[in-house]
């Protein structure tokens, strides 16, 4: 059974250069990395399957790379190897569709306090963030307003209109496009 893998995982882009149909996003993120002008909170918005989570992972790996090649990760340093092997302690993912309670957010907030051991940043990717309960959003707000210097949040959603305004106002918002046939050719 280990010979089989979901094609979306096998062919998922691993670099900014390999992301399809989102050049406006990837070039902006690459510029931020190269200039050292990183925000503490990002909101990636767009339909399912357009690369929001993929770009979040690529970005998280790139900003933690110890020997970056411009804005791309080297894939050779300890930080990149641990990410590629699924054992990075700096990158945390939360699926808010199934972990949307105040307690889930409090657990995440406890992790925010931990300083990264390898790499520069602790990156928290919250997928389907619009599914958080109102109480969970409110519990998260203080941390999003005043994060530690080592913490970066990347929130991803298919439904931006469900995100409370106080969260929206604290994020750099990136709107992902639908991928067109000509983008993939």
Regions found by a protein language model. Name each.
Residues 1-173, 177-185:
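P-loop/Walker A NTP-binding region and its immediately flanking N-terminal helices
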């Amino acid at each position: 059974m280990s010979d089989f893998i979901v094609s979306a995982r096998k062919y998922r882009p691993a670099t900014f250069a390999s992301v399809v149909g989102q050049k406006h996003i990837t070039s902006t993120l690459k510029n931020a990395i190269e200039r050292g002008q990183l925000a503490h909170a990002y909101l990636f918005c767009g339909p399912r399957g357009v690369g929001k989570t993929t770009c979040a992972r690529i970005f998280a790996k790139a900003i933690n790379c110890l020997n970056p090649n411009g804005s791309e990760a080297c894939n050779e340093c300890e930080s990149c190897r641990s990410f590629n092997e699924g054992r990075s302690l700096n990158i945390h993912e939360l699926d808010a569709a199934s972990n949307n309670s105040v307690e889930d957010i409090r657990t995440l907030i406890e992790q925010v306090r931990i300083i990264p051991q390898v790499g520069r940043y602790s990156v928290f990717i919250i997928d389907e963030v619009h599914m958080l309960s109102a109480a969970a959003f409110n519990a998260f707000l203080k941390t999003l307003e005043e994060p530690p210097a080592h913490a970066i949040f990347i929130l991803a959603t298919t439904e931006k209109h469900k995100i409370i305004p106080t969260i929206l106002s604290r994020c750099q918002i990136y709107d992902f496009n639908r991928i067109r046939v000509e983008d993939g050719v």
